């Protein structure tokens, strides 16, 4: 009869300083299907090392070990994991159940790594627990079960994928005599069902119940009676068959890894929350700075637009501060008419200004009087709270009419509800009020200077007595390049004057400078916020590294029941990403609260969240999880299952 497990001259040595300590010294052993074998020996005799090699948790230094004719030395790590998953079931002295999983969930773990569908897993786990008398304990956690019940859960887990070979390491060592007898009775039943049962023990009474007792001493077999030949041995029971297609198996495996990661995080809620805190603050900082910074930029640009955007001012002289008399009369009314005819001009308004006294009844105030055209208010985006602007008839007739700003209205008419039609003195000229320009709220503040506007023909002809203009403001049509328009304007006036006795001031350049400045400032603040996100990511990495250390035994258990290194890597990586994703979602929520609070205190700000900003925040948190979760996950995947199981 061909042995199920065949060992020939197995040796296992470990480094100890500069030397090699040989634990197993030429072990040769055959174990047949359906046998119940006990391996006995004193502590340090090498029986646990032999069990680890039998269960494919460890590899021999030399020699040959075959499982059902397959030489395990030719198998890589994933193939060994598959061999453990499909052929072996482990029963440990300390049960080695995962504390954050219920009895039913613990039993399901081997089938998760076998790729069995959830419904099939659940039915099989319930069936096994019922067979072992735990049908009313399926939802209990290990801490709620007695030692005997925990060991029965461990046995059910060993049988989940079929458990052709049951490896029991001191299965009764931590139990009272009654529970120990129950466990041994179950092992006898498994033997009767066709399982191969290998018990590692130092208890003579337990060993006596086996069909064959193999004694090991100082790494050598000193007693090995011949096997009892069995007829019609099934060689195990109900092996689990996975019929799920490759793609569905991948999706199912990912979902299970996600579920296991969530359970692991939920088992340590406070630590998980504290780990998330750095990500929450980082994401909230990034999103808030981007969103609030954008709102502030729009507010600044709106204030600049209120001054007049897409406009070009033309002044006499060579530059600001040039008071050369030969240039002061450079701009004429004919220049204004020529400019208004250009195809790229939306509107053009002249300006003639002088500081004058305004009087109404017994109120006498100083103000800046500006002679403009009716287009002036359109050029600067100003609206009216009362009345309207000048019409062409008033401009042509040098009408004695005036438009007030809201500050002037309050000074001259503090108690009047409607001031249109009232007459005031502008200098020594009576003028009828035809409108009140609405005050624009600006983050730069309001001007302290009182301002009034008259038709430029009235201002120059009736008030100042001059035939030239102090300046011309041109509004460029939408769609035309402001810089190109400025060049054409300069060319036009230079041809008309025969020389360049004027200079221009393009507000579009100011706008672009402000936009560049705000972008730079926003980038700087975003980088500061990103640093806080990186700090949060490092916090995640530190906690995950600690988690790997704390959960080393759990990793060993998962590997013992068939988890591949990639399964462990995936689970810990998903845990890190999950922490960062949930932290990112909470960070976005926090940034929404910050924005809502700012909106209450700054009603003029338009704070909005674009879908792109939210998507980038989620991508950022996911990338943080992958980046800073990789090292801990890799460390977890590289753990040796024997070393991992040995740690507490």
Curated annotation (Swiss-Prot):
Subcellular location as annotated: Cell inner membrane
Residue ranges annotated for the ABC transporter domain, each copy included: 5-243
GO molecular function annotations of the record: ATP binding; ATP hydrolysis activity; transmembrane transporter activity
Pfam families on file: ABC_tran (PF00005), FtsX (PF02687), MacB_PCD (PF12704)
GO-annotated biological processes: response to antibiotic
GO cellular component: plasma membrane
Stored SMART domains: AAA
Residue numbers binding ATP: 41-48
Chief location category: membrane
Matching InterPro entries: AAA+_ATPase, ABC3_permease_C, ABC_transporter-like_ATP-bd, ABC_transporter-like_CS, MacB-like_ATP-bd, MacB_PCD, Macrolide_Exporter_MacB, P-loop_NTPase
Segments passing through the bilayer: 273-293, 523-543, 576-596, 600-620
Superkingdom of the source species: Bacteria
The entry's keywords: Antibiotic resistance, ATP-binding, Cell inner membrane, Cell membrane, Membrane, Nucleotide-binding, Translocase, Transmembrane, Transmembrane helix, Transport
SUPFAM superfamilies reported in the protein's UniProt record: P-loop containing nucleoside triphosphate hydrolases
Enzyme class: translocase
Topology in membrane: Multi-pass membrane protein
EC number assigned by the record: 7.6.2.-
Matches recorded under PANTHER family: MACROLIDE EXPORT ATP-BINDING_PERMEASE PROTEIN MACB, MEMBRANE COMPONENT OF TRANSPORTER-RELATED
Subunit structure of this chain's protein: Homodimer. Part of the tripartite efflux system MacAB-TolC, which is composed of an inner membrane transporter, MacB, a periplasmic membrane fusion protein, MacA, and an outer membrane component, TolC. The complex forms a large protein conduit and can translocate molecules across both the inner and outer membranes. Interacts with MacA.
Function: Part of the tripartite efflux system MacAB-TolC. MacB is a non-canonical ABC transporter that contains transmembrane domains (TMD), which form a pore in the inner membrane, and an ATP-binding domain (NBD), which is responsible for energy generation. Confers resistance against macrolides.
Family: Belongs to the ABC transporter superfamily. Macrolide exporter (TC 3.A.1.122) family.
Stated name of the protein: Macrolide export ATP-binding/permease protein MacB
Organism: Shigella sonnei (strain Ss046)
The encoding gene: macB
